[in-house]
Swiss-Prot record:
Residues 184-288 are annotated as: SET-like. Keywords: Cytoplasm, Methyltransferase, S-adenosyl-L-methionine, Transferase. The keyword Nucleotidyltransferase does not apply. It catalyses: L-lysyl-[cytochrome c] + S-adenosyl-L-methionine = N(6)-methyl-L-lysyl-[cytochrome c] + S-adenosyl-L-homocysteine + H(+). Belongs to the class V-like SAM-binding methyltransferase superfamily. The keyword Nucleus does not apply. Residues 46-273 form the SET domain. The gene is CTM1. This is Cytochrome c lysine N-methyltransferase 1. Its EC number is 2.1.1.59. GO terms for biological process: methylation. It is found in: Cytoplasm, Cytosol.
Length: 551
């Protein structure tokens, strides 16, 4: 294929890129017989080279390729190299906080637009953009972000994605030499194609000690980026780096497959990670593989609807949304698919125990219960905490502080940049009659860890609250009609996945089955959490000010 020639890729006989079952493309073994006997004893005899790629695109080598134009195209090359340096150099400050993958998207956009404006750009990069990044339709979250924010407004991940897209677009418009209003749809296309294809490639820092000195770099690897992801039971290949040449190589793994027994058109599949994150898959690729049982781990995370948490108070008194804000508790649940193909709540996470804290209220109301107070008691505690009891105008200092924390309470931000002085607890666990702040949370957490009776009572109260939430959320999801998001696959896939998981959890509750993983396997305590939402800026910060401190 033309792209292989342009990008210096070598493809083994019997291998081809073809349409896959999800509407995209994959790499297939169309003629297994062509691979029989191709294993090289010098490589250990347990693998066959299917693909070798010399041209890899990442931030570093895109910069190098554009700088190299100075010596390749005389004046045109110098002009293009200077323009690229100018655009990127002036963009660094605006893009200092974005990920390296976002920078890769930005570099690709700049190179593409420079080519459109008549600047000399490297042919292989230009062809890759035209053929792959612009020629691949990926119905992932970035291509339907408006609909995703309508249906999942409460999920911080999609606000973060939207903010990244807006930041890249705004920077692009302001830095390109032609002040055209470049379409954000073009950016979304390149963004969606890039994030769905990017691979984490290890890069050597010091040749003499490679294993201890390398970084993982988000990279686009032509042809290899057509290879799809499989679980541990279907994976039959893996990629590696040729340390001597720097090439990326795709190997057929002969420890798991025998090419002589493969059927024609067997798909080549690699495993990216041991953790299969349904939400991440839908966000990046626009689809979620079916349930399966593997030696890996499949998870699904969802964020509570914060309006529900605020309007449906626990015990008719505790505003769960407000409580989670003040204690900076991530308002998300993580579900794990166990070996019996059942979705269960991951209660091994430290953050899950923090979710339980507001529910650690005795039903008898005589042992311990939470109290919210933003009046004189809160004022006293704030003044003591900030040591501002000797200011000239204490009333004015308190008024300013109260205005600020009230603004945060009503904002969409999940984290509060103040100590939780408005929340106190009356408890027989404490020597004092009343305590407050993060120390208070630690006391309750310690009691939860060391009192099985209290833990059971707390989880029961949490489950009762969750059961009502499930009824509410399932009703919302079941009102969804696919026509609402026609051709926006990521939205419909995410709704279907969340609905499926929540229905299974509710069924377990109705059948008096445990909904908790209750595993002693330490790997479950380290699974990744969803990000928290912190996108609104306080009105007392001007546009040029640094973001407020959330620590």
């Amino acid at each position: 294929m033309e792209l292989a020639n342009i990008c210096n890729a070598t493809i083994a006989k019997g291998i081809a890129v073809q349409k896959d079952s999800y509407g995209g493309y994959g790499v297939y073994i169309v003629d297994p017989g062509a691979l029989v006997g191709c294993n090289d004893p010098k490589l250990g005899g347990d693998k066959i080279e299917l693909l070798r790629v010399s041209s890899v695109f990442n931030v570093k080598n895109l910069m190098e390729a554009m700088n190299a134009l100075e010596g390749e195209y005389a004046e045109d090359g110098q002009r293009a190299a200077d323009m690229f340096k100018s655009i990127i150099g002036s963009s660094i400050e605006e893009l200092s906080a974005v990920s390296e993958t976002c920078l890769l998207v930005y570099f690709m956009m700049v190179i593409y637009l420079m080519g459109e404006q008549g600047y000399a750009v490297p042919m292989k990069i230009s062809r890759y953009i035209d053929t792959v990044l612009l020629g691949t339709t990926v119905n992932n979250a970035s291509n339907c972000i408006e609909s995703m924010l309508i249906h999942y407004e409460h999920v911080a991940l999609f606000h973060e994605l939207d903010n990244n897209l807006q930041k890249l677009h705004k920077t692009l418009i302001s830095k390109m030499p032609s002040k055209k209003n470049y379409s954000i749809e073009l950016l979304r296309q390149i963004y969606s194609a890039t994030v769905s294809r990017v691979l984490e490639i290890p890069q050597e820092l010091h040749e003499e000690n490679y294993m201890d000195n390398y970084v993982v770099t988000p990279s686009l690897v032509p042809i290899l980026d057509y290879v799809n992801h499989g679980d541990k039971t279907s994976r039959n290949a893996y990629y590696d780096v040729d340390r001597r040449k720097g090439d990326i190589i795709l190997y057929l793994d002969l420890t798991v497959v025998n090419p002589g027994k493969l059927k024609p058109n067997t798909e080549v599949l690699i495993t990216y990670k041991d953790i299969e994150d349904s939400l991440a898959m839908i966000t990046k690729y626009g689809f979620d593989p079916a349930n399966y049982t593997t030696t890996g781990t499949k998870i699904f995370s969802c964020t509570f609807d914060k309006m529900y948490l605020s309007t449906n108070k626990f015990d008719n008194e505790i505003d769960i949304r407000n409580f989670y804000q003040w204690f900076s508790i991530n308002p998300s649940l993580q579900f794990v698919l166990n070996s019996e193909n059942e979705w269960l709540i991951n209660d091994s996470l430290a953050e899950f125990e923090r979710l339980l804290v507001p529910f650690a209220t005795s039903s008898q109301r005589n042992e311990h219960y939470w109290i919210y107070s933003d009046g004189d008691d809160a004022r006293k505690r704030f003044m003591e905490y900030f040591d501002i009891d000797e200011v000239e105008d204490e009333d004015e200092a308190w008024a300013q502080l109260e205005t600020q924390f009230k603004w945060f309470e009503s904002s969409e931000n999940d984290l509060m940049p103040f100590p939780p002085c408005v929340w106190t607890v009356k408890s027989k666990f404490l020597k004092e009659k009343e305590a407050t702040g993060y120390e208070l949370e630690k006391v309750i957490q310690n009691k939860l860890e060391n009192s099985r009776a209290l833990y059971n009572e707390t989880t029961n109260q949490f489950q009762a609250y969750l059961e009502n939430y499930l009824d509410y959320r399932i009703d919302v999801l079941q009102e969804y009609s696919p026509e609402d998001t026609e051709n926006e696959n990521a939205v419909s896939q995410l709704i279907a996945r969340e609905l499926s998981v929540l229905l299974k959890i509710r069924d377990r509750i109705n059948n008096n089955k445990s909904i908790f993983l209750n595993s002693e396997d330490k790997k479950y305590a380290k699974l990744p959490l969803l990000p928290t939402k912190n996108v609104e800026r306080p009105p007392w910060l001007s546009e040029g000010d640094d973001d407020f401190d959330q620590d």
